[in-house]
Design a protein with these regions (language model features):
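ATP-binding pocket architecture of kinase catalytic cores
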Residues: 3-60, 64-82, 99
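Active-site acidic catalytic loop and adjacent metal/ATP-binding pocket
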Residues: 5, 91-136
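A general structural signal marking secondary-structure boundaries and capping sites
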Residues: 41-52, 97, 145, 163, ...
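All-alpha amphipathic helical-bundle segments outside canonical DNA-binding/catalytic cores
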Residues: 56-59, 165-176
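N-terminal alpha-helical segment
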Residues: 64-65, 86, 134, 180
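ATP/Mg2+ or Mg2+-diphosphate-binding catalytic cores
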Residues: 71-74, 78-81, 185-220
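Short amphipathic alpha-helical segments and their helix-coil junctions
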Residues: 118, 153-171, 207, 211-218
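Active-site activation/catalytic loop segments of kinase-like enzymes and analogous catalytic loops
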Residues: 135-164, 177-195, 210
Length: 220
């Protein structure tokens, strides 16, 4: 049994340090790692909610997008001229996703949130965890780590244990756009409010470019 919780009390949680390799995007693109990550996501989506009690959060990416847009408008972002267009694209994406099944998702599947300790993978940084569509975690994993079309098809087919339907693929592509839009807007907000010594302007540029590329595939 893996026990990483060292202590907990109301408002406090102490975890043991995990020795291991923090994965890179290139690592995630290796089939050997994808074959470990997929069952991890299955367990997360299927089992975590069964262990929880009390109030639970929901992470609906389109609400998050609207909230970030509102913050950027209120705080006079340097990108204010782009916000109406991004808001409209968010509406288009939400309509494209349509009805969803709810699972308990991680919702922040950056490569740096996976640690390989030599015997298993750990998924860390659960700040955004909450109920969401399973398509968001799958799309988030794909868009954050540059999976190929073949890898995306493998991921969807093996997650749902069925051939990939046009509807599933369309929702997945919309969620990839939404994932990149959320990351872009988060970076824009961080430009204004973060105290970290990090080039958020460049990070915004990189993510906006990736979003534009994905949008052109979603809505050519």
């Amino acid at each position: 049994m893996y026990k990483r919780q060292a202590h907990h009390a109301p408002g406090k949680l102490i975890l043991n340090f995990i020795e291991g390799k923090t994965l890179s995007e290139a690592d995630i693109r290796q089939d050997a790692y994808l074959e470990q990550i997929l069952p991890m996501l299955h367990r997360c989506h299927r089992d975590l909610a069964q262990q929880m009690r009390g109030p639970a959060l929901i992470f609906w990416v389109f609400h998050v997008i609207r909230d970030y847009l509102g913050t950027l408008e209120d705080d006079g972002s340097r990108m204010s001229h782009m916000l109406p267009t991004l808001r409209e694209k968010g509406r288009t994406l939400e309509a494209a996703v349509g009805s969803v099944d709810l699972v308990y998702g991680h919702n922040d599947l950056l490569a740096a949130n996976f640690i390989d300790d030599g015997s298993r993978l750990w998924l860390i940084d659960w700040d955004y965890a909450g109920y969401n569509s399973p398509l968001f975690d799958l799309a988030n994993l794909a868009s954050n780590n540059g999976l190929s079309k073949d890898q995306e098809d493998w991921l969807l087919q093996h997650y749902f244990d069925a051939p990939v339907s046009d509807q599933t693929r369309h929702g997945f592509e919309a969620m990839k756009c939404a994932s990149l839009l959320r990351e872009t807007l988060w970076s824009m907000v961080s430009e204004i409010h973060s105290q970290l010594e990090f080039d958020f302007v460049e990070y915004t540029r990189e993510n906006l470019e990736r979003f534009d590329q994905q949008w052109s595939r979603f809505a050519p």
